[in-house]
Amino acid sequence: MKSEIEKRFRGYIFSRPFMQERVPQHVQNIIIRDYCSKHGIQYLLSATEYAMKNSTLILRQLVQNLSDIDGIVAYSMFQMPENDDERQGVFDSVLSLNKEIHFAVEGLSLYDNETYKHIENIWKLKKTLPHCASLEII
């Protein structure tokens, strides 16, 4: 008999590069499965985002269908929309439903306003760093 009911999360992976990174789908699924195992999460098969640039259709469908599960486990937080308004809209929708998004590679999760701010700060840094002067330029 289980002492506690596991939370149920749907995986979310990419079939295209994201933020100049490319990870094979089977590797993304291995990382998500391992993350779920370590965190006592029941892993539901991953949904794969369409390959078209900037597509978020599958992510939006996952968010719309969160009523039956506890949340989403994405391979990386950098698979969320790069556009600030779009990404924040996804995060706001998840939080308004009292659900969670976990990011397996970074070991982070979004479940309240504090984690929301933390994740957005990391996004700001990631987007700003390429525009900073390097030692080679100085």
Give, region by region, the residue ranges found by the protein language model.
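Short, structured surface patches at the beginning of a domain
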Residues: 1-138
